[in-house]
């Protein structure tokens, strides 16, 4: 098992806190955005970041028109198909999740690769979790991305995300009770 999703799943299994926050170690996110996410975690089970707000995209950040609009339109497709909260970025890896919500999500994680993030979003929608997406700073990356550094690879990843989203939409219509929440006392 290897890849972004495999690393996330392993980290989630080993995390011990009541709130679990995830950020890639490539320098693209600012530490003070964690404070914003924590503030929203009082009211929401899952807080996702969005890197698509122009004023928070720093010079040198890898968020050109292709990636920005690709992430935006795939997010809007997800929002439309599932009638969810406002979504503007399916690829942002900065997120915060409450332990109880994570315990409900974990049995349904199946993706080890680069589109694990959108799977987590779809599952949190299907499980009717209280979630929100908030704008975060996005800065220049340290090192080269093997995914977003190549437009063709990013385009193919976008198509895989769309296929996965459509698959979940179809499965949720055919078996609407497939994604129950655990009951806790």
What do the PLM-derived regions correspond to, one by one?
Residues 2-14, 19, 31-114, 141-156, ...:
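Acceptor/aglycone-binding surface of glycosyltransferases and processive sugar-polymer synthases
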Residues 27-29:
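Acidic metal-phosphate-binding loop of nucleotide-sugar-dependent transferases
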Residues 80, 84, 127, 168:
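Phosphate/oxyanion-binding loops and surfaces in catalytic or ligand/nucleic-acid-binding neighborhoods
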Residues 85, 108-112, 121-139:
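Catalytic donor-sugar/metal-binding loop of nucleotide-sugar-dependent glycosyltransferases
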Residues 118:
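DNA-recognition element of transcription regulators
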Residues 139-141, 171-172:
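C-terminal tail/cap regions
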Residues 160-185:
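C-terminal, non-catalytic tails of nucleotide-sugar-dependent glycosyltransferases
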């Amino acid at each position: 098992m290897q890849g972004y999703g495999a690393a996330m799943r392993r980290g989630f299994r080993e995390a011990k806190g009541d709130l679990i926050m995830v950020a890639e170690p490539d320098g693209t996110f600012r530490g003070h955005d964690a404070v914003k996410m924590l503030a929203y975690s009082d009211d929401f089970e899952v807080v996702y970041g969005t890197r698509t707000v122009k004023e928070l995209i720093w010079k040198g950040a890898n968020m050109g028109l292709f990636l920005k609009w690709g992430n935006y339109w795939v997010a809007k497709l997800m929002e439309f198909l599932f009638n969810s909260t406002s979504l503007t970025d399916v690829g942002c890896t900065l997120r915060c999740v409450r332990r109880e919500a994570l315990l409900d999500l974990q049995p349904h994680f199946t993706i080890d690769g680069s589109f694990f993030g959108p799977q987590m979003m779809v599952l949190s929608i299907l499980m009717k979790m209280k979630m929100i997406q908030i704008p975060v700073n996005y800065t220049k990356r340290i090192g080269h991305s093997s995914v977003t550094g190549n437009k063709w690879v990013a385009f193919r990843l976008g198509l895989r995300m769309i296929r996965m989203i459509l698959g979940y939409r179809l499965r949720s219509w055919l078996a609407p009770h497939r994604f129950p929440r655990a009951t806790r006392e």
